[in-house]
C-alpha cells in the first residue's frame, strides 16, 4: 500500500457505512470507512475508519439484528465512546479522499452502494457531492452471477463482520473474484 497520496483522476473511492437501520427518515450513520484503489482495483490506501457518536435514544431504536451484530463486532461500544459527529467524520473523510482523487472523478464504489449514497446525501451532503454521479456497485455483478452462473457463488468467501472497512475489503475481493471467474478479462 502506498502511504504517499498521489492525486489521480482514475483512482476509485470505495466507501461503506454502517447505520442504526435502513430507514432514511429515522436511522443514522454509526460508522464510515473509505479505501482508495487504482483503476485495476489494487488497494493504494485505507482511509480513516470512523465510529460516529449517536445518543442512547438513537441506539435504542435499532432492531434486534443491528443490536446483536454491532454489539458482537464492538461497534456500539466504539460509537458510545466516539468524539466524532457526522460533520467531523465527513470533513476527515473528505480530507483523505481529496488527496487521492479529484472532485467529481470517481464513481461511488461498494456493495449495495445506492443506499449508502442516500444516507450520505442526507447526513454528509458535501461528501456525497464529491463523487461522480455514477456508481460501481459490486452487488449488480453478484445479481448477474446469481442468475447466469450461480455455481461460482459457492466459491466466494466473505467475512461478514459488518465493520465498514472489512466490508469494503470484502467488496473489493468480491469484484476481483468476479473478474477472474465470471467476467474473465484477459
UniProtKB/Swiss-Prot annotation:
Keyword entries, A-Z: Cytoplasm, Exonuclease, Hydrolase, Nuclease
Protein name stated in the entry: Oligoribonuclease
Family to which this protein belongs: Belongs to the oligoribonuclease family.
Enzyme Commission number(s): 3.1.15.-
Location of the active site: 133
InterPro entries recorded: Exonuclease_RNaseT/DNA_pol3, Oligoribonuclease, RNaseH-like_sf, RNaseH_sf
Residues covered by the Exonuclease domain: 12-175
SUPFAM superfamilies: Ribonuclease H-like
Amino acid at each position: 500500500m502506498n502511504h504517499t497520496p498521489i492525486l489521480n483522476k482514475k483512482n476509485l473511492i470505495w466507501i461503506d457505512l454502517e447505520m442504526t437501520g435502513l430507514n432514511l427518515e429515522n436511522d443514522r450513520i454509526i460508522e464510515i470507512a473509505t479505501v482508495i484503489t487504482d483503476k485495476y482495483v489494487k488497494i493504494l490506501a485505507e482511509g480513516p475508519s470512523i465510529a460516529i457518536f449517536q445518543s442512547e435514544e438513537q441506539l435504542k431504536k435499532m432492531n434486534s439484528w443491528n443490536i446483536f451484530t454491532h454489539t458482537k463486532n464492538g461497534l456500539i461500544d466504539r460509537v458510545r465512546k466516539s468524539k466524532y459527529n457526522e460533520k467531523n467524520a465527513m470533513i476527515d473523510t473528505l480530507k483523505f479522499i481529496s488527496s487521492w482523487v479529484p472532485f467529481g472523478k470517481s464513481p461511488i464504489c461498494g456493495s449495495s452502494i445506492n443506499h449508502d449514497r442516500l444516507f450520505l446525501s442526507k447526513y454528509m451532503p458535501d461528501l456525497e457531492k464529491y463523487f461522480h454521479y455514477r456508481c460501481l456497485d459490486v452487488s449488480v455483478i453478484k445479481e448477474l452471477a446469481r442468475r447466469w452462473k450461480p455455481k461460482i457463488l459457492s466459491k466466494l468467501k466473505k467475512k461478514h463482520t459488518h465493520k465498514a472497512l472489512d466490508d469494503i475489503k470484502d467488496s473489493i475481493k468480491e469484484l476481483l473474484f468476479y473478474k477472474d471467474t465470471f467476467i474473465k478479462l484477459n
